[in-house]
């Protein structure tokens, strides 16, 4: 559903953010 899509987007954003910090 919509909520699952939102959670997936937030997860991707968080992962990208963490990756950017570590690099």
Curated annotation (Swiss-Prot):
Biological process per Gene Ontology, one example term: defense response
Major subcellular location class: secreted
Coiled-coil annotated residue ranges, if any: none
Keywords from the UniProt entry: Amphibian defense peptide, Secreted
Domain of life where this protein originates: Eukaryota
Function, in words: Has no antimicrobial activity.
Name of the protein in question: Dahlein-4.2
């Amino acid at each position: 559903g919509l909520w699952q899509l939102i959670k997936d987007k937030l997860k991707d954003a968080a992962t990208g953010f963490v990756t950017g910090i570590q690099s």
